[in-house]
Amino acid sequence: MSNQHTLLISNLLPVGSNISTWWNFGSMLLTCLILQITTGFFLAIHYTANINLAFSSVTHIMRDVPYGWIMQNLHAIGASMFFICIYIHIARGLYYGLYMNKNVWLSGTTLLITLMATAFFGYVLPWGQMSFWAATVITNLLTAIPYLGTTITTWLWGGFSINDPTLTRFFALHFILPFAIISLSSIHIILLHNKGSNNPLGTNSDIDKIPFHPYHSYKDTLMTISLFILMFTILSFSPDLFNDPENFSKANPLVTPQHIKPEWYFLFAYGILRSIPNKLGGTLALLMSVTILMTAPFTHTSHMRPMTFRPLAQMAFWTLIATFITITWTASKPVEPPFIIISQMTSILYFLFFIMNPLLGWTENKIMMNN
């Protein structure tokens, strides 16, 4: 009976035999989420959401709380790992045409927006210089909304400037949103298993399926262990690798940092925002930088689902990756030549991918038909 039970469990989730390592990032994201919620809970126990005490409470966690430095650094490094995994996860989806499973793709994009909001609120909590000024700049973008902008901004701040009520509500939101992420992740996984996962060839894998366990479960375990090794290596040798030096100073509303910038994982969107010399235009471009992903399922024109056998689409895809990295780099630099023009050019190239993709699909279809 026990053998039959094991076989039953193994066959509950038949998976295509040819899915590659790029399909392991979903489980790695789940691992990151569990780690963030666990470390976040222990940090919340010792954190004080008050503008006079927040910075001191983070210092207290680092210095006085047993293993507090591990919790704090793991939480900070874990956030970066989370975004590295999610960007690879999205890139894999774009390359292999996984967006054709519309419900999964749209729920995933909603998850990304929720995750970015959560990370933004979390970045404000230490109440360092960069935390304060990044919050001031980003929340101030709401004033670009016609008619309602100023009212919404004042309501979000809880006053006429970023102050104690702002920090309190940002802490509340940072605490509650991960549970929304759990719910959305559950929906994402349920929708995925409704049709089943795709594979690198983009073909129907019903005729060639293997049990998830032990084959893919061991592969997942290997990648998760690799993730932990990388995280603990950074934690041990360079715990402040992803931190901004400016954030080691307490927030001072009277002194503006020379160069205001968010965490590295928001720099691509911030670079697009900064490349447009108009407040409303920049805000719309910032929103579009993420929401444009939602257009992918509706603009797919190629007869082939993945880019595996589409050389023109592959060139466009790798140009997008190079563009993403370049925008991230330029956004970390001051607003001066040559970074302004590079940022503007790469921003155009970023959006051009989503416009060119359907046109390249049509072109490739024509080439195939002629041959």
Swiss-Prot record:
Listed transmembrane segments: 25-45, 69-90, 105-125, 170-190, 218-238, 280-300, 312-332, 339-358
Keyword field: Electron transport, Heme, Iron, Membrane, Metal-binding, Mitochondrion, Mitochondrion inner membrane, Respiratory chain, Transmembrane, Transmembrane helix, Transport, Ubiquinone
Residues binding a ubiquinone, per UniProt: 193
Residues the record lists as binding heme b b566: 89, 188
Cofactor(s) needed by this chain: heme b
Any one GO CC term of the record: mitochondrial inner membrane
Chief localisation class: mitochondrion
Residue numbers binding heme b b562: 75, 174
CDD domains from the UniProt entry: cytochrome_b_C, Cytochrome_b_N
UniProt function note: Component of the ubiquinol-cytochrome c reductase complex (complex III or cytochrome b-c1 complex) that is part of the mitochondrial respiratory chain. The b-c1 complex mediates electron transfer from ubiquinol to cytochrome c. Contributes to the generation of a proton gradient across the mitochondrial membrane that is then used for ATP synthesis.
PANTHER family the record matches: CYTOCHROME B
Name of the protein in its database record: Cytochrome b
